[in-house]
Amino acid sequence: MGSTSDKIAGKTNEVAGKVKKNVGEATGNNELRAKGAAQETKGKVQTSVGKAKDAVKGAVDRM
């Protein structure tokens, strides 16, 4: 995946995970809350990977 794709997928997973987590908390559904928290974390990692790719590309471009 390219850096932009990673960042978009990451943000999508973050938002979807946050929604699931909040719905799970509101309804007392611990399984949904946990799945949402995991998806949110996955999204944060994907976003970080995209940012890291941008940083590496920027460093290489400056050489």
Curated annotation (Swiss-Prot):
It holds the Pfam family CsbD. Disulfide bonds: none annotated. Residues 51-63 have a biased composition (Basic and acidic residues). InterPro entries: CsbD (IPR008462), YjbJ_sf (IPR036629). Signal peptide: none annotated. Residues 1-63 are annotated as: Disordered. Belongs to the UPF0337 (CsbD) family. This is UPF0337 protein Atu0782. It comes from Agrobacterium fabrum (strain C58 / ATCC 33970) (Agrobacterium tumefaciens (strain C58)).
